[in-house]
Amino acid sequence: MAALAALEGHEFYYEYLEPTDKLGADVPNPKSHICYGFATHVVILDDEGKVSEVYAAHDSGRVINPIAIQGQIEGGVLMGMGYALTEDWPLKDGVPQAKYGTLGLFRATDIPQIHAIYVEKDEQLPVAYGGKGIGEIATIPTAPAVQNAYHAWDGKLRRSLPLSDTYYSRRAHRD
């Protein structure tokens, strides 16, 4: 723990470059990592602590189908919000103790405004019309962004999912 405490307040920057072989290279066991996406999300809470807006910026290469990428980002954000705030799937000896009806999926009335931001570079990759793809990456940054929003809102650091002492956890106890 002391090592982690020493890192408090520092910023870290990292660039990931995986060696890759040229597409179609005649080499044994070629490495074909051709592209990587990037995503970052910012969550805005209202005065009650309810998520009112999510800004989701994604570098997914060239946007080929805007409707599909919008849907993928919105679905990923909602899935990440569920993990962060409302969904609980307790297990006992590996057996689920909840049913889908009691899982805590978001209600349609609880869906915040989601702003999808497409980051497209002038220089496109020489594959598949410059597209990188969008998928699970839309879910990954959401829960940390929700935790960061709550930490900024009330100063409490929550370390487990679903997050406790939120607008949503308090509402669950009332319903």
Placement of each model-derived feature along the sequence:
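C-terminal catalytic domains of large/alpha subunits in multi-subunit enzymes
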Residues: 1-175
